């Protein structure tokens, strides 16, 4: 076990490179199961969830090699098992993404019900119902989804709720199905579009990515290719807030400004000066931020994965802001920890009301999920004295070398044994 120690009060300044998006890399790594030969995936972030996915693929028999630039070559021709065991799946919800590819390519799958962050029910029933509509036989027994099929058949699937992983799983399954599949109320997130772009480059026939209706014409085979995943928009937003909250000035390289419109608008509302180019964003903040109010929504709305970070900003901003969470349940656990640091926060249903205070005070705090842990680090950067963030294994699931990147910008932060 490790923790982060942060001494706040330093203005962040400098340049950093943004990593590839974990939420794009994970489904694309699962999509390698669909290929009929070796496939190389580049711009992969070095994260615990990526390592877990590689271990899962390797356990199934996929041949894996990784070079010094974190390019992963996966060769599914040596696959000998369609079993995703509990000891791997329990730590990461995205492991459910192997279900669709295994069924479509090999006709069977046995996948443990997934784990991951404890931020609401996040049911997998939409995956199961969609695959049943395509002709698969699925049962849930002893904590496992057990599935079989001949060749999947195209179907019209109307998702009851917008689900990113559900859309991705069904899209991958439909790519090799017989006939045409239409997915309505599909997720529109950039990571879904990136997966569709990857599948199309492999030979799939997918139309409508980025809209709420996907049309997938099944093909007989998909080729192994090289594909680079898109930059991480959530990591980008987190470091922009780190600069804004400390009155700093930074430039992000290898990022994608067009994916961050909802976040950049709110940062400008808070008083930041922002400039963008094709693959870079610069931000400068002078003085205390102004409070902002946000309401989370599926893309292209304000991302739920950024609300905890804006909570940290509102804690020390001038004025009162509100954060309304409409996507997941139980996603304000970080607020209790911020109150230990002197934050003035009141929770009413699915809304947090934050009245900015002149300063936070360093304190021992505990991370409860991935984005909550990032928000506590942000609060520590601006707090007086030392903040100790425990249970940082959460943050290692989604941020590559966070203490190194922040130290590169001038933060006083270090990782120590707990």
Swiss-Prot record:
The active site is at residue 117. It catalyses: phosphoenolpyruvate + UDP-N-acetyl-alpha-D-glucosamine = UDP-N-acetyl-3-O-(1-carboxyvinyl)-alpha-D-glucosamine + phosphate. GO terms for biological process: cell division; cell wall organization; peptidoglycan biosynthetic process; regulation of cell shape; UDP-N-acetylgalactosamine biosynthetic process. CDD domains: UdpNAET (cd01555). It holds the Pfam family EPSP_synthase. Its EC number is 2.5.1.7. The modification 2-(S-cysteinyl)pyruvic acid O-phosphothioketal is found at residue 117. UDP-N-acetyl-alpha-D-glucosamine binds at residues 93, 305, 327. One of its GO terms (cellular component) is cytoplasm. One of its GO terms (molecular function) is UDP-N-acetylglucosamine 1-carboxyvinyltransferase activity. Pathway: Cell wall biogenesis; peptidoglycan biosynthesis. Keywords: Cell cycle, Cell division, Cell shape, Cell wall biogenesis/degradation, Cytoplasm, Peptidoglycan synthesis, Pyruvate, Transferase. The keyword Translocase does not apply. It is found in: Cytoplasm. Its main location: cytoplasm. Phosphoenolpyruvate binds at residues 22-23. Belongs to the EPSP synthase family. MurA subfamily. Cell wall formation. Adds enolpyruvyl to UDP-N-acetylglucosamine. This is UDP-N-acetylglucosamine 1-carboxyvinyltransferase. The lineage of its organism: Bacteria, Pseudomonadati, Pseudomonadota, Gammaproteobacteria, Chromatiales.
